[in-house]
Amino acid sequence: MTQLYVGSYGDGILTAGEGITPAPSPSFLAAHPALPVLYAAGELGEGVLLSYATGGGLSETGRRTSGGDSPCHLAVHPSGTLLAAANYGDGVASLHHLDADGRFTGEPILLPHQGSGPHPDRQRGPHAHQCVFHGDVLHVSDLGTDEIRRYTLTGDALEPVRLAPGMGPRHLVFTPDGRVYVAGELDGTLRAYDADGWRELWQAPASAAAGVNFPAHVDAADGRLYILNRGPNTLSVFTADGDKLAELPSGGDWPRHFAIAGDTLWIANQNSGTVDAFTLAGGLPAPTGETIAVKSPACVLPV
């Protein structure tokens, strides 16, 4: 049975059907790949990372600095031995070793960065937005520098991928067919690349709506791409080759994140304070009418 957790800018972490566990602005959650352990990013000026044992509620088992300002994303390596954090405020990414019980151990590895982009307000400096492990390389999307930063698992810097100026890469997803897709928050695009050489294959507006669409999270499932647009409050669906299949209302205001569990897609609508369910059983997302009220939801995690 799937358990749904919701991170937020509100009172704490919601365990659906069980209640709220108080936590400091837990805007992003990640699960250990093999253990009943949950991690949360406390998006504060002095960022914190928290670990919890799951089952019968959440029990905090660890807490440490994120190594930077305003951590907004976490990723756990498939081996379960490393957790990566992206600190949006100062652009520092960090690596944290995990022991056999999934607890923090040793000193964190800090990965600061420098640079800027052409946007006068949003790209004055680096802004790490997401961490993704692909093979034995950590990829960090940097909205502030229009780069995908790359590091070894020991923290050695590799050559970054430089994307279109002003794109503002927010989230990305690798797919088994050797492609990677990136949501451009600042230029409103969804772009596809060859994952080996990062050759651009296609690009498309993430939304057909007029005005600024502020794309947020992007993910892939069953050969389709799903991307949220916070400006028009929509979810867009594309094929792997860039053909748009649908764009539909997200069910609320300012859709920030979504997750798929089986035939259900959950959307965290931050400003309206709801997590809304959509069924994928008919091929394209359709609202089920199921809604969970959460103060400022920012992340949905089915485990």
Residue ranges of model-derived segments:
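Blade-loop segments of beta-propeller domains
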Residues: 20-80
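A short beta-strand motif characteristic of beta-propeller blades
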Residues: 17-22, 60-65, 109, 115-122, ...
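Asp-box/WD-like beta-propeller blade repeats and closely related beta-sheet repeat scaffolds
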Residues: 60-130
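Conserved beta-strand positions in repeat-built beta-propeller and related beta-rich domains
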Residues: 6-9, 40-44, 85-88, 140-143, ...
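Blade-level signature of beta-propeller repeat domains, shared across WD40, Kelch, NHL, RCC1
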Residues: 270-276, 286-303
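Beta-rich, blade/repeat-based domains predominating
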Residues: 23-33, 67-78, 114-135, 163-179, ...
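Short loop/turn segments immediately following beta-strands, especially the blade-tip
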Residues: 52-57, 95-105, 152-155, 193-199, ...
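Loop-centered beta-sheet repeat module
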Residues: 137-188
